[in-house]
């Protein structure tokens, strides 16, 4: 018998299993999944009644039992149809038991993003913070944690009001490898260490700590793994098969997921659309069991959710399975517990009837989901922790103004000839360009309604300056019809602010950029404005970098600022930086490459190391052999700083001694601090400013080739007045100085190492590792990349399922 959910929807919806091959969408090219309404549905959320409802006499309501035992008891009560109905992100619940439906799909990338917002009044908005790419540029761990804490509080308020669940598909902890990637804006940048720390802080803030007794919000680390291309050159994310060496999987693509699982104790992980080395991520037992659970220590009770439609994609377009039922079976057995989509709900019964999966196989994932809902207090009534959070808490946390602080701290000053901050003699400004008067664009993507959105134009008007506004040109326009109005406005002002760059019409989910140049004729208009002989400040907005070399080289462009996606208070933050009310201290967390970088080798080449044969010049700041326009870690101040240290030689450390010394407070010896990088930072200029620090390591220990350097720590010092000094102390962990061999093992190699402060290397501290090399993470052998599915009777991995 077809499951109840199928009976309910078959008459209303087209189904994949009823379509002929000729009607299939070619998802090798199309990057947007065609999700059924059931998957996309917003539900009226409610909590189970454990006081007097049918569930009240069942073990799921017994708080003396463990979350897993409670969940197991609940799922054991389901009929087979009821079980299947709760395998998708839109779970139908079980009405006869009083178990309400539940929507797993929530969003909290930089604020509450997918709740059931009402039209006006209470619960019509939530705080909209800067995008993660801008957050991370602040280099402030405390700020990231604050934001995550506020977001989790606001999520709980919506949940308690019946407007959302207690889990989210956030954060995105993929690394921003290639500059054309449309979703790089959602990430903390191109560095795996920074991404790992960001993930740790955001996850533990969302969840209410490291493995708390009661989960505040269930976080989901996504997209696991090797996912960083949307649609480049018609290579769809839904069908991409990314070829990645075990060395670089271990070294670059998975460390954020190790930290999320082992250290932050994240309770959910999302497997990605793409395949890696021939195996779709959601059907990859090596990824989901051998690595994630056995090696990365992801909780046995944590659940894996497929990206939305990714289980279906195991069949179409990957061709790894012969049909959608086999794709469901492959994914269930590999370890994908919940299907964001409808494949499990519509086809796991077929898989069961064909003896591809057992009831217990299907139960495992549903038990894991409900185990986490139990731990989040979902079944524990109004006296459960966090159930007292209300709309008043949304109002109070928004009033903390952290969205403004995050925008200010994430702004990066790329170029300045002392034009900034603007002189007090400047009384009027012309605000020109396609980003000048935007509002919603400030939010990037995955956002909900904000309480307000302050455009750059409004920000300058609120600063007290006399403002002249002209659009000038649109982002992608080649028309010069607005140039004259822009030039007229500029001539009337003492200084010119051009706000442009890119936005989510150019970089987005399912849409990579074709190039990394400034789109349209924005540079032409900037060039004409630069000929007027007035102070000219350019705001480069958007998540991904564009080649601003012409602006860097133009002496008449006096200052250049990267603002990213600064959120609801972005306009005030930008204006306050430019007028000098606040001082910039952000640093780029991506490399700004010259335009030709995006043209000389395929964006789907996942190899970081340079390769003359393929034309790959090396990817990320660690391996790039060319000259960037602006380096990763670049960022200027309004003041000057002097950095010094008492010693430039930290001595030597015996590897075996380090690893065998007791490590109280750490689960593994490699997590402990090897040494503290310490420097005195003095403000030698005339303006108060924060100071940001990146600490790099470099070495020729271990296998060649050698990365130029890599990040091992960072910090932000606040509010240094002129003449003041502060001590910078950055812990450097044992595992952060390890390298990766060709098999993927993380190894401590004996040899000489240097720690350097920022790109300028203003402080350099040497140390030496002695003794025998030692493996601190053994990378298991991947036996699945050449795996031929026994479920499918030995079919080839990549079938031609598209007509």
UniProtKB/Swiss-Prot annotation:
Disulfide bonds: none annotated. Optimum pH is 5.1. Optimum temperature is 52 degrees Celsius. The keyword Lyase does not apply. Pathway: Glycan degradation; xylan degradation. GO terms for biological process: arabinan catabolic process; xylan catabolic process. Residues 1-18 form the signal peptide. GO terms for cellular component: extracellular region. GO terms for molecular function: alpha-L-arabinofuranosidase activity; xylan 1,4-beta-xylosidase activity. Keywords: Carbohydrate metabolism, Glycoprotein, Glycosidase, Hydrolase, Polysaccharide degradation, Secreted, Signal, Xylan degradation. InterPro entries: BXL, Fn3-like, Glyco_hydro_3_C, Glyco_hydro_3_C_sf, Glyco_hydro_3_N, Glyco_hydro_3_N_sf, Glycoside_hydrolase_SF, Ig-like_fold. Its EC number is 3.2.1.37. Belongs to the glycosyl hydrolase 3 family. This is Exo-1,4-beta-xylosidase xlnD. The gene is xlnD.
């Amino acid at each position: 018998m077809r499951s109840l959910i199928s009976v309910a929807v078959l008459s209303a919806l087209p189904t994949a299993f009823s379509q002929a091959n000729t009607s299939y969408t070619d998802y090798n090219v199309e990057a947007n999944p065609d999700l059924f309404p059931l998957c996309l549905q917003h539900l009226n959320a409610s909590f189970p009644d454990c006081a007097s409802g049918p569930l009240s006499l069942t073990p799921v309501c017994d708080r003396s039992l463990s979350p897993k035992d409670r969940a197991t008891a609940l799922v054991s009560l389901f009929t087979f149809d009821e079980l299947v109905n709760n395998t998708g992100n839109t779970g139908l619940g079980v009405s006869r038991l009083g178990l309400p439906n539940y929507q797993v799909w929530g969003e909290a990338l930089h604020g509450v993003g997918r709740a059931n917002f009402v039209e006006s009044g209470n619960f019509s908005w939530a705080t909209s913070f800067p995008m993660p790419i801008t957050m991370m540029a602040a280099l402030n761990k405390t700020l990231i944690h604050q934001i995550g804490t506020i977001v989790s509080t606001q999520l709980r308020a919506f949940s308690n009001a019946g407007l959302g669940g207690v889990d989210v598909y956030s954060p995105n902890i993929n690394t921003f490898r290639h500059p054309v990637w449309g979703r790089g804006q959602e990430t903390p940048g191109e560095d795996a260490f920074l991404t790992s720390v960001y993930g740790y802080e955001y996850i533990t803030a969302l969840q209410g700590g490291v493995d708390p007794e009661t989960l505040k919000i269930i976080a989901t680390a996504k997209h696991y793994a090797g996912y960083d291309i949307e649609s480049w050159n018609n290579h769809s994310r839904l069908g991409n098969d990314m070829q990645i060496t075990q060395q670089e999987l271990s070294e670059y693509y998975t460390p954020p997921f190790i930290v999320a699982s082992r250290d932050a104790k994240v309770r959910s992980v999302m497997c990605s659309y793409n395949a890696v080395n021939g195996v779709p991520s959601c059907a990859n037992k090596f990824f989901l069991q051998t690595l994630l659970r056995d090696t990365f220590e992801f909780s046995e009770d944590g659940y894996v959710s497929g990206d939305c439609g990714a289980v279906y994609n195991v069949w179409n377009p990957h061709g790894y399975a012969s049909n959608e039922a086999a794709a469901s079976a492959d994914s269930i057995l590999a370890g994908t517990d919940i299907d964001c989509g409808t494949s499990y709900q519509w086809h796991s019964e077929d898989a069961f009837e064909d003896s591809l999966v057992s009831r217990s196989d299907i139960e495992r994932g549903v038990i894991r989901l409900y185990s986490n809902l139990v731990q989040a207090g979902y079944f524990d009534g109004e006296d459960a922790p966090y159930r007292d959070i209300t709309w008043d808490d949304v109002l109070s946390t928004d009033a903390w103004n952290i969205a403004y602080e995050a925008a200010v701290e994430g702004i990066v000053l790329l170029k300045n000839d002392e034009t900034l901050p603007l002189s007090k003699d400047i009384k009027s400004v012309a605000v020109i360009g396609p980003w000048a008067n935007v509002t919603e664009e400030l939010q990037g993507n995955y956002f909900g309604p904000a309480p307000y959105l302050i455009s750059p134009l409004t920000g300058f008007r609120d600063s007290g300056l006399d403002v002249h506004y002209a659009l000038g040109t649109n982002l992608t326009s080649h028309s010069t019809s607005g140039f004259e109005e822009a030039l007229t406005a500029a001539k009337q002002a003492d200084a010119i602010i051009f706000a442009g760059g890119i936005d989510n019409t150019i970089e987005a989910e399912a849409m990579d950029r074709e190039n990394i140049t400034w789109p349209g004729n924005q540079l032409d208009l900037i060039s004409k404005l630069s000929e007027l002989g007035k102070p000219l400040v350019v705001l480069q907005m958007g998540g991904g970098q564009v080649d601003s070399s012409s602006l860097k080289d133009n002496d008449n462009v006096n200052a250049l600022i990267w603002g990213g996606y600064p959120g609801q208070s972005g306009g005030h933050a930008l204006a306050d930086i430019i007028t000098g009310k606040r001082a910039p201290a952000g640093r780029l967390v991506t490399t700004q490459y010259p335009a030709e970088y995006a043209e000389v080798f395929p964006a789907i080449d996942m190899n970081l190391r340079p390769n003359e044969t393929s034309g790959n010049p090396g990817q990320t700041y660690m391996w790039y052999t060319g000259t960037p326009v602006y380096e990763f870690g670049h960022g200027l101040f309004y003041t000057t700083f002097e950095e010094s240290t008492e010693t430039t030689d930290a001595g030597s450390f015996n590897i075996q001694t380090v690893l065998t010394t007791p490590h109280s407070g750490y689960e593994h010896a490699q997590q402990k601090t090897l040494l503290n990088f310490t420097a005195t930072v003095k403000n030698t200029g005339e303006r108060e400013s924060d100071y940001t620090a990146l600490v790099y390591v470099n070495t020729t220990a271990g296998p060649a080739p050698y990365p130029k350097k890599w990040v091992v720590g960072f910090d932000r010092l606040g509010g240094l007045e002129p003449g003041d000094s502060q001590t910078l102390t950055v812990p450097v962990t044992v595992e952060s100085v390890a390298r990766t061999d060709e098999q993927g093992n993380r190894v401590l190699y004996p040899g000489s190492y240097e720690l350097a402060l920022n790109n300028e290397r203003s402080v350099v501290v040497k140390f030496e590792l002695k003794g025998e090399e030692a493996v601190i993470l053994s990378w298991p052998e991947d036996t699945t990349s050449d795996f031929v599915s026994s479920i499918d009777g030995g079919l080839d991995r990549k079938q031609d399922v598209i007509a």
